[in-house]
Design a protein with these regions (language model features):
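Non-catalytic, polymerase-adjacent accessory regions of viral genome-replication enzymes
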Residues: 1-216, 502, 506-534
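Conserved polymerase palm-domain catalytic core
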Residues: 28, 32, 274-398, 402, ...
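Reverse-transcriptase-like RNA-dependent polymerase core
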Residues: 135-139, 149-150, 157-160, 195-225, ...
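Conserved pre-motif C helix in the palm subdomain of viral-like polymerases
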Residues: 207-256, 288-293, 338-368
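GIY-YIG nuclease signature motif recognition
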Residues: 213, 244, 286, 348, ...
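A short acidic-Thr-Gly-centered motif at the start of a beta-strand
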Residues: 218-220, 263-282, 366, 613-622
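Polymerase palm active-site segment centered on the conserved acidic dipeptide of motif C
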Residues: 314, 375-376, 383-462, 478-479, ...
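Conserved short loop/helix modules at catalytic or binding sites
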Residues: 421, 634-686
Length: 734
């Protein structure tokens, strides 16, 4: 029986594309252009049908990753080491090429055949046709699509206006720095990784373009255009810091018993356990720009506080602080936080949530003397007390003083019986809690006809039903709250009727297994049942008598479909393309051949880099040809010179299958000539998404244009990307 598990997140939303001019003209001092509000009637998490080529390249990536993981598992199984101490790697995987395992050769051949035999079919419906048309319209648009901060809106913004808004937001809190600062931080990252013996696993911090979202929920938005600046550049050392902070936070939370909530459910449990609710009043506060406001001094005070509950070494403190040395990039130019320190708790960094939680526990410790039942979820605080309004006002002032002492600004409301906290409304008078929805923020869900794995769209209504039931006090509250959610489901193509379910907290115990996952992409236009064929291959290659059957069978190897790029990624690529148009155009690659372009092996483009090329070897006596497909991350001229050296030097005979063929012709004294041409270009290894488009494109051409790769071998599908090595901290020169 086919066992396919689909593990994918479904942040939700639905579909109609309408352009709405804002009620007021939006202008900016330097421009007469206006923002056009774009309300997508569908979720940007919806997935369009990909091209056959895009799908196949993703499938190649999945097969390559699966075989690599399986090689390592098989190698350790076949070569056991007694009493081997497991090294702490902080979640970083090895970057070493997997060892050769002959027992997997049949599997590799059959997976190769599976990829090249994939069949496609026509798949279309009204929703996908609409999505396809919208993507075409976006491709023709000259403006950028900027998301709203807390609503589902988007705004079409002229690129000049976007640049001005981004620049203004950056200059408010950051100042320019130079590459020496980047090198200094990278050197320190390498020192830490080397001490932990993981510098051969950790990549240098990738420079990622900062961006903004628009706070269209703020008053007078049309005239002020308030923005939120987001910095996606993340220090890889933050992953180590995250592990350390998780341990510290868990210990401090357990020993102090402070009300630090992890989610809405824990807040609801706290609310349910309140006695004499009618006598109580709420105290609610929000820490303004909490992440950005955490200073180095405050974090050091927090760590000193935590040391009363858990030992924290100087090395661990050093790692935590180093992870906060964050830079922001705009067009590859580095910016650093204003002031004398480069300390910055960037929202979205690997350890920012844990840092926020630890500082939150420290702040809660400073509020304990108030004798108020207070709790905190990240930057949102909530408490209750039975004091008089006058006494509560005094407590309010004291809370403000405490936060101000730590250079934190808060907004605070007191003496209320009803509050909206996270996604729940709490009522002390009635003792009831119910779902809360922000004003003008209608729910949107992924459409039933989105190109998601079927298990996701099938289980979506049940997941929404479970969530709404868990934040509803009873069936009556649930029924009153569901109309907008029911309508959103209907608009997204679902016929399911939401029905209240009593909260069942019993968790099913699952036996833990060491699973090796195969994660092929899913697309509705693929007629081949990839999951079923894959599992049949596992059965055929590893029968009960096989030496690896114990670790490679249907219980230990499973399939989990993953998603193709969604509509949000289409918008991001469009914005990147428009932004790049503002930069100076890239100069032609040119040629540096002594005889000029007329003798250039690549028609005057030999200085071009990051390309896949084809070499054609022709016997001049019989006109028979053989072809070879290769790639280079550097310039073609450098790679060409290496090929020429291999053709001349006996030691280079086995460097490539191309040089091996040329040497065979030379031994047989066969006259030949070699010609070269460019096939395609692609970006080299990206540490952010762990993908090398250049290598994937080469593998695709070898597999699906075999006439241009007669000298290449099938094993090249499983070659490890060499470009990733240059991105490792171990390769940084200090």
């Amino acid at each position: 029986m086919l066992h396919i598990v689909c593990r994918a997140l479904f942040l939700v939303t639905s579909l109609n594309f309408t352009l709405i001019k804002p009620a007021l003209d939006i202008s900016i001092e330097h421009s007469t252009d206006v923002m056009d509000q774009v309300t997508f009637g569908y979720s940007t998490k919806n997935i369009p049908i990909p091209s056959e080529k895009d799908f196949t390249i993703e499938l190649i990536k999945s097969v390559e990753k699966f075989v690599k993981n399986l090689k390592w598992r098989a190698f350790h199984y076949l070569n056991p080491v007694n009493n081997r101490q497991r090294k702490e790697t902080y979640g970083f995987n090895t970057t070493s090429p997997p060892p050769k395992v002959d027992e997997l050769n049949e599997l590799k051949d059959m997976l190769y055949d599976l990829v090249v035999s994939i069949k496609f079919k026509k798949h279309s419906n009204e929703f996908q046709s609409k999505l396809k048309e919208d993507i075409r319209n976006i491709a023709r648009e000259s403006k950028m699509y900027i998301a709203a901060d807390k609503t589902n809106n988007f705004y079409k913004v002229p690129k000049e206006m976007h640049e001005e808004l981004l620049k203004k937001q950056i200059q408010k809190d950051y100042k320019k720095t130079d590459e020496s600062k980047v090198k200094d931080i990278t050197k320190k990252d390498k020192d830490i990784a080397s001490k932990l013996e993981i510098d051969d696993r950790v990549y240098t911090t990738a420079k990622r373009q900062s961006f903004i979202t628009l706070k269209d929920h703020k008053p007078n938005f049309q005239n002020t255009q308030p923005c939120r600046l987001l910095n996606p550049t993340k220090s890889e050392i933050g992953k180590v810091s995250k592990k350390i902070l998780e341990k510290i936070v868990a210990t401090v939370r357990e020993k102090t018993k402070f009300n630090q909530w992890k989610n809405s459910s824990s807040v609801i449990d706290w609310f349910k356990n309140l006695d004499d609710k009618k006598k109580l009043k709420f105290i609610q506060f929000d820490i303004c720009e909490f992440y950005a406001s955490i200073s180095e001094k405050l974090l050091l005070e927090t760590l000193e506080f935590a040391e009363a509950f858990i030992d924290i070494s100087d090395e661990e403190k050093d790692i935590i602080l180093q992870a906060k040395r964050n830079l922001l990039f705009d067009k590859n130019i580095p910016w650093v936080k204003k002031g004398s320190s480069d300390f910055d708790v960037a929202m979205g960094s690997f350890d920012s949530a844990e840092t926020c939680d630890l500082v939150g526990l420290y702040l809660l410790s400073k509020l304990q003397h108030l004798k108020v039942n207070l709790g905190l979820y990240r930057d949102d605080g909530l408490g209750v007390c039975a004091l008089t309004p006058r006494q509560v006002d005094l407590i309010k002032k004291e809370i403000c003083k405490i936060f101000e002492k730590h250079n934190l600004r808060i907004t605070i409301d007191v003496n209320h019986k009803i509050v909206d906290f996270l996604d729940v409304t709490f009522n002390l008078e009635s003792g009831v809690f119910k779902p809360y929805m922000k004003p003008n923020d209608n729910p949107l869900y992924i459409n039933k006809n989105s190109n998601h794995p079927p298990s996701i769209t099938k289980n979506l209504p049940a997941a929404i039903n479970k969530r709404l039931s868990s934040i509803s006090a009873d069936e009556g509250v649930f029924k009153n709250a569901i109309p907008p959610y029911q309508e959103a489901l209907k608009n997204s193509g679902y016929e399911t009727n939401l029905k209240f379910e009593a909260n069942n907290t019993t968790k099913r115990k699952n036996r833990s297994r060491n699973i090796t996952w195969f994660n092929p992409p899913y697309s509705a236009n693929v007629s081949t049942s990839i999951g079923a064929k894959f599992l049949n291959i596992i059965d055929r290659c590893f029968p009960p008598s096989h030496v690896l059957n114990k670790i490679i069978n249907r219980n230990t190897v499973k399939v989990s479909y993953r998603c193709m790029p969604n509509f949000s990624q289409v918008l991001s690529k469009h914005n990147a393309k428009i932004s790049k148009q503002m930069e100076a155009p890239e100069a032609p690659p040119g040629c540096n051949c002594l005889g000029g372009p007329t003798v250039c092996p690549l028609d005057g483009q030999c200085k071009m880099d990051k390309l896949v090329y084809q070499a054609t070897v022709k016997r001049t006596d019989t006109q028979e040809t053989e072809t070879y497909t290769g790639l280079t991350g550097g310039t073609f001229k450098t790679r060409y010179n290496k090929h020429m050296s291999d053709f001349r030097t006996p030691s280079g005979e086995h460097a490539t299958t191309l040089s091996k063929h040329v040497w065979q012709l030379k031994r047989e004294k066969v006259p030949y000539e070699v010609s070269w041409k460019k096939l395609t270009r692609g970006s080299t290894f990206n540490p952010t998404n762990k993908t090398c488009q250049l290598c994937l494109k080469e593998k695709y051409l070898i597999m699906f244009s075999p006439e241009g790769a007669t000298l290449n071998t099938r094993n090249e599908l499983y070659n490890t990307c060499r470009h990733r090595l240059r991105e490792l901290l171990s390769k940084v020169k200090t």
